[in-house]
């Protein structure tokens, strides 16, 4: 058993969802290693658990193939800083959380220097750029996956992988308490709400806010009693959203929330959101949703030719079925989004029945990935530290 007092763990998260996963993992590891040091790149959740960060996490949270090129010099400089720091610190293990294009190169270099490496959250190799499996095998001692079909993919290539479930599936109740969520947000439970979630990245807010606000205007015309909840991850994203709103929909009333996306989804009769981890969270909150996504045309041109899956949203990928509408690029228009969203808001008998059936399907998927992920992930780290993988 490794010395519990002097353990150092390198850990890098690249965006908000990874920061949440990292915080849960750190909490679980501190049960076994209460004196452990954590150093790397952290967001507010990991910082709250005592992780030291080398740079602001948002500096590496860029999206899209084209957008990365713009920030490449800075990204490379930060990556070099992480590698140099880790080689100097010589952590007992390095954990890269998601952000594969950033983390895998770090893991590869550290593993070559004899540092154990673990990648938490499988890159979407099953969806696109499948040849990355070779690099993943070279860069990591172990991959942790939160989707069952991901482990099956790794098993085909004999790459060590554990399915650990997803921490959000553990945290969120199978039957979320809407009354309590309304209380937390100081909202009237008898009112009708739609949640609008434009994403956590600058580019997502830029591309999705206009069509999402225009959708809200159309929904308001058709359902005047509906109120809109807009959770934003930080002050930067709120200012960005407000600037766009002033041009697109200055008179549309919305309730701004400081984070609190989960409570908003639980309260909402339906949600309009970006693809990504938010779609999984929305499913776990049992909120019927429409997924919209837009990016720069050239980024989309490249992505369309690289992606190998039928779906982009996690509920649909988990179910291997089109449970929720996906409106991508040219389909991500106010008219089309409003049409799909309206289905969930109709108070007809068939509408209510369809909604109940969807929530039942969401619950089944919730149970599938509810595995006490923090504990499972921490145990995987401990096993790797003790050469039991």
UniProtKB/Swiss-Prot annotation:
Any single GO CC term annotated in Swiss-Prot or TrEMBL for this entry: membrane
UniProt record, GO biological process: lipid A biosynthetic process
Reaction catalysis annotation: a lipid X + a UDP-2-N,3-O-bis[(3R)-3-hydroxyacyl]-alpha-D-glucosamine = a lipid A disaccharide + UDP + H(+)
EC number: 2.4.1.182
CDD domains linked: Glycosyltransferase_GTB-type (cd01635)
UniProt entry keywords in alphabetical sequence: Glycosyltransferase, Lipid A biosynthesis, Lipid biosynthesis, Lipid metabolism, Transferase
One of the record's GO molecular function terms: phospholipid binding
SUPFAM superfamilies, per database record: UDP-Glycosyltransferase/glycogen phosphorylase (SSF53756)
Record's function text: Condensation of UDP-2,3-diacylglucosamine and 2,3-diacylglucosamine-1-phosphate to form lipid A disaccharide, a precursor of lipid A, a phosphorylated glycolipid that anchors the lipopolysaccharide to the outer membrane of the cell.
Family listed: Belongs to the LpxB family.
Protein name in the entry: Lipid-A-disaccharide synthase
Name of the gene: lpxB
